[in-house]
A protein has these predicted regions:
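Mid-to-C-terminal alpha-helical segments outside catalytic/metal-binding sites
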Residues: 1-20, 31-86, 93, 155, ...
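Active-site neighborhood of phospho(di)ester-bond hydrolases with catalytic His/Asp-centered motifs
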Residues: 19-22, 97-98, 138-139, 166, ...
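Conserved, mostly hydrophobic/aromatic
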Residues: 23, 87, 123, 165, ...
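Histidine-centered divalent metal-coordination motifs
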Residues: 23-29, 197, 232
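Generic structural signal for well-ordered alpha-helices
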Residues: 80-84, 120-128, 153-154, 180, ...
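A structural motif corresponding to the C-terminal end of an alpha-helix
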Residues: 86-93, 126-135, 222-226, 280-281
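Active-site gating/metal-coordination segments in enzymes
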Residues: 93, 99-202, 206-207
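Catalytic pocket-lining loop regions of alpha/beta-barrel enzymes
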Residues: 160-164, 172-287, 332-334
Length: 335
């Protein structure tokens, strides 16, 4: 084997194993981007989130990635095929996509709140149906339009044959809001799991007070038969509570989105000690996720980094795919 080959090639030569990316974001594709509320804002202007996408712009061939985008036609040529290309480059079998439906609180300059909407039907058509065996998804749900509307959002996800829903507290409010409880009850009835964001957020109008993982304690207590996936494990927010949630509740799992190789050098993020804690106390309840395309420039490097950490091979395989396959009861079609 050539010494020039990377970690992924060496893994493939020794044992056939495919990564499952449990957390990625569709909707930022150039085609029809203004039809999906909030999605153009990821590229437009000089906001924190737009600046965070400049690396992706460079990798996607933008000749001026640090310029300010003002019009949709200036967006990079980003497509569903781009997802598949990056997945293939990083030995990723499949990816779980996050459909989003949320509205922030009012804030100065926007009395109606900022809206973010990636429709279930769009993701099903452009990703799941177009690339069989490569994608699954969760449907966006929020309580801003009332209890019954939230229940109908759950039903929409079920009708799209999604395995679960996503609550995005920065654009939806507290996840233990009683107005969401009928939606959780409907998920139990239909056999859907619930994913809840607990990381920090830099999008317009979002408020940090809603995203602390402490509020998932209520949901897990009140719905012990509901499978809950805690997204981001409270990173930059309350990671210790995130860890405790998974230890305390049999029905609560977590991902480690985003395992950025540089940020993982610091204790304020997820350093090696954090990952080894997960390996020791909850090796079967943690999933690998990337927030792609936010992580596009380091998409392959993230896999290399995890696979090179001083962790057992058994745990690496659980973390990088086997745990999430079991969680979804996923039947691989590409192996």
């Amino acid at each position: 084997m050539s010494e020039q080959q990377g970690t992924i090639e060496k893994i493939l030569a020794q044992k056939p194993f495919k990564v499952f990316d449990s957390h990625a974001h569709p909707g930022l594709e150039k085609k029809g981007i203004t039809e999906r509320a909030g999605c153009f804002d990821f590229w437009r202007g000089n906001t924190v989130v737009a600046r965070s996408m400049m690396g992706a712009r460079a990798f996607l061939g933008d000749p001026n990635p640090f310029s300010t985008i003002t019009k949709p036609e200036e967006c990079p040529n980003f497509t569903p095929e781009t997802f598949v290309q990056y997945m293939d480059s990083a030995n990723v079998e499949a990816m779980c996509l996050q459909c989003i439906h949320g509205v922030t609180d009012p804030y100065p300059g926007n009395k109606d709140g900022w809206k973010w909407y990636v429709p279930n039907e769009y993701v099903k058509k452009e990703f799941i149906d177009a690339f069989p065996g490569r994608f699954t998804a969760v449907g966006g749900v929020h309580p801003r339009y009332g209890k019954q509307a939230a229940v109908e959002m759950v039903i929409s996800a079920y009708e799209c044959r999604f395995p679960g829903i996503k609550i995005h507290p920065p654009t939806s409010g507290y996840p233990n809001n009683p107005d969401l409880y009928p939606a959780y009850e409907k998920c139990q009835e239909l056999g859907l799991h619930v994913q809840i964001h607990t990381g920090v957020e830099e999008l317009p109008g979002t408020r940090a007070k809603y995203q602390d993982p402490v509020y998932l304690d209520d949901v897990a207590m009140d719905f012990p038969n509901l499978k809950i996936l805690q997204l981001h494990c409270g990173v930059f927010n309350n990671p210790m509570m995130g860890l405790w949630n998974v230890i305390k509740h049999d029905n609560l799992y977590t991902d480690i989105t985003i395992p950025h190789p540089t940020l993982m050098q610091f204790k304020y993020y997820w350093d090696l000690d954090h990952i080894r804690f997960l390996e020791f106390f909850m090796p079967d309840k943690v999933f690998y996720g990337t927030d792609f395309p936010l992580s596009l420039p380091v998409y392959r490097a993230m896999v290399d980094n995890i696979m090179n950490l001083p962790l057992t091979t058994e745990f690496k395989h659980k973390l990088m795919g086997d745990n999430f396959r079991k969680f979804l009861n996923w039947k691989s079609k590409t192996q």
